Every structure is written in structure tokens, then in C-alpha cells.
């Protein structure tokens, strides 16, 4: 077993060796290095063929038509293209958008930008388990609502929203539905027909593919129109200009092919490991799980250890690669906005750790992690005056702290 142990698969995954192998064949003179848009020679045709195959592989995992797949530089761009693209194209119909407070920053900040442009955005608040009710969404719909954007699986707490029901509602009201499926695709079944989504963002690097490549599913029937956000040579049916990076697209295709084949067995393996981890730490005193445990993706475990500072715990767990909050915002010392939206107080939000398991996680690593967590929590709490007060029966919410 090698240290440190990687338990941060929700931040990124290592590239699967089979994917890396395929990518290597698209880079050098003796490989498929051509520009897929070069129509006048074999180098271009071969590259185009490789891109077409990958487009089919991505479409197959999503239950989509390959013509509905638009390649982008990643899910951040996919989210921007979907939300701004729809908002700008349908501005004549209305300027109201609905999303949630627990979305990824790539959705929230895109909506903030649209607010600066004169659009109105409603931010829904989740229930304490991280889920939304259909009534909440229905109650927020207006005559001028043009788009609802809700993530399938949350990146911090791993809860799975009932997208099919939301899709049904939006379809009946003729409102477009965009779904950020970065954390669900390849982990749980995602079928764009069953979910009734109009736009769906995916990324390769959360599915053991390379970073820097993603895709946006854009429905053809009923047809969804977008205003391009990147202008140039008119690639990707005019929706996203820029030379297609053959090696990255091929890598994404292979990653999605493997995911389709291995998702069921891999899900069981990861679920068993997560259960092993939770069973190993759940009897520690004052430990709380964040988000619904039933409606949850297999690899995610988000836990708050009361009376332990999250940052100091991460330092104590230096042999484990874990995070507090998401990687995208972990540089800030603010408590997780996702956990705050669930109603957690600052202290509990600050003491949360996200463990995310994946394809290459082993039982041996989980057992090592359990021992390390138990030892570290015990040691850190011994040093904590708050823990001492809690053990003495002091209700810490009633304590008046002096401000100097």
C-alpha cells in the first residue's frame, strides 16, 4: 500500500491506463494527429473518424443521439454554454431562471453574471437532507421562466436529485431543464430520455478520463436552441468553435465506454468500501453524516466531526488525500456554502470532511484510513477545550464568548 491514500475522487480521478493508452495514439506523427476538420487528406479523415467514434461512445452512456453531443473544454464551459446560451437565445420569451443554492460554482457564478445582465434568478433552498421537493420547484415557476438548472448529484454531499420528476414537470410547462451531471455520469445510470432533460453537462476527468475536455448534451427533439459563447470556425454545429483536441476527445470516449461496461460492478465494489468506512467511524461520539444516506451516489461520504476543526483534521490526516468542501473552493477558509444551505451551523460545517472513493480504492486503504481517523479525532479532541466543556455537559450554544 502506497501513501498518501487518494480519497478525493470527487475532485478528480486518475486517468485509467486504458484511456491513456488510447490517447497516446493520437499525438505523434505516426498516430492520429490530424485536424478532424481537415477534409482534404487522410490525416484529417482518420482524426475525424476517431472523434466520431468517441462522440458515439459518449452518446451511448447518456442514451443520446451522437448529433446531440457538443464537445467543450470541460463542465465549467458546458454549464456556461447551456445557461448563457439559453438565456441569450430565449431572452424574448422571458428572463427568469431557477436554480439552487447548492449548485456548483460554475452554475451559481454563471447565474450571477446573468443577474448583472438584467435576468432574474430564483435560488432554491434544499431540505436538511440536501434534496428538493417537486412542490418547491413548481412553486417557483413563473410565466417568464425560461430555464431550470438543477444538478443531478451534488459534488460535496453526493445526494441524488429526482431529475426525472423535475424533467416531467418542466416538459409539461414547456420550460427547458439543464442538469449538471458531472458527479453522476459513470457512477449511476444517466439516460437523457428517461430523465427528460434538455441540456446536460458532463466532464471526462470525473470518469477516469483526461482533464480539459467535457461535453454538453443539447436535445434535438424537441429542439433546443443556444446562442454560441465561443465564436470562430463554426465547429460543433456552430455551438462551440475551436479545433477539436482529438487526443482528449478519444480519451473521453474510451473513459465513457469503460464506464458503461463496468459501472454496475464498480458501483457495488465502491458501495461496499464506503459502507466499510462508515461502519468503521460511525460509532465515534458526535459524528454526523451530511446529506441523505439513501439517495446518494456510491463513492461519497461527507461527515462532520463535532469539536474538531476541519482544517486541523485534514492536517492530522496528512496520509489521506481528502477535502473539506469542494476542491474548487477549498482554497477559501469560509465554511462550505453547500453545508450552510443544509442548515448546518458554522462549527459543524467547518468540521466536515468529504471522503470520495473510486475505482482504485482498496479495502486495505479503507482500514488504514479508519484507524488514522479514529486516532486523530481522539488526539485532537483531547486538546480541545470545547470537547472538554461538551463532556462536562455544558451547552455550548448558551455560552457567551467575550470579545476582546
Curated annotation (Swiss-Prot):
Q: Enumerate the catalysed reactions.
A: (sulfur carrier)-H + L-cysteine = (sulfur carrier)-SH + L-alanine
Q: In which pathway does it act?
A: Cofactor biosynthesis; iron-sulfur cluster biosynthesis
Residues binding pyridoxal 5'-phosphate, per UniProt: 75-76, 155, 183, 203-205, 243
**Active site per the UniProt annotation:** 328 (cysteine persulfide intermediate)
**Binding residues for [2Fe-2S] cluster, per the UniProt record?**
328
Q: Does the keyword Iron-sulfur apply?
A: yes
What cofactor does this chain's UniProt record say it requires?
pyridoxal 5'-phosphate
MF term (GO), any:
pyridoxal phosphate binding
Q: Name one GO biological process term.
A: [2Fe-2S] cluster assembly
Q: Which InterPro entries match?
A: Aminotrans_V_dom (IPR000192), Aminotrans_V_PyrdxlP_BS (IPR020578), Cys_deSase_IscS (IPR010240), Cysteine_dSase (IPR016454), PyrdxlP-dep_Trfase (IPR015424), PyrdxlP-dep_Trfase_major (IPR015421), PyrdxlP-dep_Trfase_small (IPR015422)
Q: What is its EC number?
A: 2.8.1.7
The record's subcellular locations are: Cytoplasm
Q: So which domain of life are we looking at?
A: Bacteria
Supply one GO CC term from the record: L-cysteine desulfurase complex
- Does the keyword section mention NAD? no
Query: What interactions and quaternary structure are annotated?
Result: Homodimer. Forms a heterotetramer with IscU, interacts with other sulfur acceptors.
Q: Which NCBIfam families match?
A: IscS, PRK14012.1
What is its biological role?
Answer: Master enzyme that delivers sulfur to a number of partners involved in Fe-S cluster assembly, tRNA modification or cofactor biosynthesis. Catalyzes the removal of elemental sulfur atoms from cysteine to produce alanine. Functions as a sulfur delivery protein for Fe-S cluster synthesis onto IscU, an Fe-S scaffold assembly protein, as well as other S acceptor proteins.
Family recorded in the similarity comment: Belongs to the class-V pyridoxal-phosphate-dependent aminotransferase family. NifS/IscS subfamily.
This protein is called Cysteine desulfurase IscS
